[in-house]
């Protein structure tokens, strides 16, 4: 039998002692006392922050929202069907954050930034907090660059600038999503990153929007964040903040971004559901008292950054649904007071066949003509006033038996202007064509046509102008001004088209 020498034993013991590494891990652990309806109550989590992420034994995550003396109220980021009473919960020590990178462009993701389009994982090396502080006053500069929507009614009378927050408000089925998606389609070639956030919508509706983006080639510069109607309330509540974090990533990289929240009414309802289940005291319309803060901290993140920060921008178009046109309800008034203007879509106009169904009279942009190119200011300056006067005169004409010639001419001009503003869906117009269209209407060139002929005439005029007078588009796009030369070219094209059109009608 071999004998071990003392010095060998000594050497082995020394090596083992040197290799010994005593690590003490401290974990903040609690126990589930109650779970159900997307809410869990936990005891034992003594040191936990508001908004901290927690992890349950079976893998589900949650966010600590209620910190009470006896327990902690957690909202679950999943169905939580496998969570058992008495199981352990671990505090992570982190606030909710998501990975961010250029690789998200062209993808459909959920509120946790996980892909749901079946095209594999997204590789990202950086991450951002879902809730970040908004840029301060010194970090911002005033809005001065236009963000073209491609819709004549908006770009001419309710202009939107890069860094602005413009609310789209109206009843259900009035074309709110169509206005937002057309704006995204119009950003093609404009170097604008778009983020479309779908909150609590039907999966079929979201699929339809994504299909439109693919067909029109818009998906290459767009990210879709989607939480469907069957998603947990927590994820519907988080989805807009996830979208904002992605848009901010590009904004701070000196890029221009556009974010659509479709729609914030459903986010507020998800937050109300969570709050009531957490036994928080309800206020007006059963919403929690801080529902204003829910939306203000989200929308204040939209900004036009100053030159020191790279002049990036984040333009927000939140959508809010009204009931029977009631804009004085709690959520609509809250969001109206936060945003820099609103585009009001009317069910009556929609049903009358005027689409987009924008009520120009009560829609407003608080940035105004600062967000328009000079050419648009020159031709569209009085169009909003003319349309408002037309609406007033039309209401009066219903009761008046006989109108003087001036009033009749004003009514005729107004009807043609309203016809001029009609546009089919997924057909945004470049600003040069908009300038030509508005000039034709406001200068009286459509007065000799029947109302039914206006759309056909304008379509042919735009094509004729593009084919025979390409200099017109070059002048507007390069100088951003409606010069005398541009006006002469446009007048020639209109006269030529009027002659051609009258010959067509005769034959």
UniProtKB/Swiss-Prot annotation:
Highest rank taxon of the organism: Eukaryota
Gene3D superfamilies: 2.40.30.20, ATP synthase alpha/beta chain, C-terminal domain, P-loop containing nucleotide triphosphate hydrolases
Keywords on record: ATP synthesis, ATP-binding, CF(1), Chloroplast, Hydrogen ion transport, Ion transport, Membrane, Nucleotide-binding, Phosphoprotein, Plastid, Thylakoid, Translocase, Transport
Coiled coil in keyword set: no
Single GO MF descriptor: ATP binding
InterPro entries in the record: ATP_synth_asu-like_sf, ATP_synth_asu_C, ATP_synth_asu_C_sf, ATP_synth_F1_a_nt-bd_dom, ATP_synth_F1_asu, ATPase_a/bsu_AS, ATPase_F1/V1/A1_a/bsu_N, ATPase_F1/V1/A1_a/bsu_N_sf
E.C. numbers: 7.1.2.2
Binding-site positions, ATP: 170-177
GO cellular component: chloroplast thylakoid membrane; proton-transporting ATP synthase complex
Gene Ontology process terms (BP): proton motive force-driven ATP synthesis
Sites annotated Required for activity: 363
Reported modifications of this chain: Only phosphorylated in mesophyll cells, and only when cells are grown under high rather than low light regimes (70 vs 900 umol photons/m-2/s).
Membrane topology: Peripheral membrane protein
Modified residues (Phosphoserine): 383
PROSITE patterns for this protein: ATPASE_ALPHA_BETA (PS00152)
Localization per Swiss-Prot or TrEMBL: Plastid, Chloroplast thylakoid membrane
Main function: Produces ATP from ADP in the presence of a proton gradient across the membrane. The alpha chain is a regulatory subunit.
Protein name, as recorded: ATP synthase subunit alpha, chloroplastic
Lineage: Eukaryota, Viridiplantae, Streptophyta, Embryophyta, Tracheophyta
Gene that produces this protein: atpA
